[in-house]
Amino acid sequence: MIRTFRHKGLERFFRTGITSGIQAMHANRLRLILAQLDQSKAIADMNTPGLAVHPLKGDRKGTWAVTVQANWRITFRYENGNAEVVNYEDYH
């Protein structure tokens, strides 16, 4: 289950479907990723074909990322079976 968001536009999209805070061309992919993330209890639940889930390194160790498109990612941490600090970012 998704407990907290860092990106307010992504949270608004997740709760209402309003795309004003995200790139509209990413809406369908974001909807798929967020639905999967909200249903997951562990990182293994996110390891489905096409999601490209991967751990981050260095100072971002403990954070996971899912590719949205090109450099855009959904990043998050798991705490007690919940996705926390869910963010929508281009960190490259």
Which residues are covered by each model-predicted region?
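Glycine-rich, flexible loop/turn motifs
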Residues: 1, 9, 18, 42, ...
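Short amphipathic alpha-helical segments enriched in hydrophobics
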Residues: 14, 34, 38-45
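Arg/Lys-rich, positively charged N-terminal/basic patches that mediate binding to nucleic acids
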Residues: 1-33
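A short, surface-exposed loop/turn module that caps and links secondary-structure elements
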Residues: 41-64
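Alpha-helix boundary/capping detector
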Residues: 28, 36-40, 60-63, 82
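Generic alpha-helix structural propensity
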Residues: 5, 25, 29-32, 38, ...
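Enriched for short, Lys/Arg-rich terminal
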Residues: 54-57, 64-92
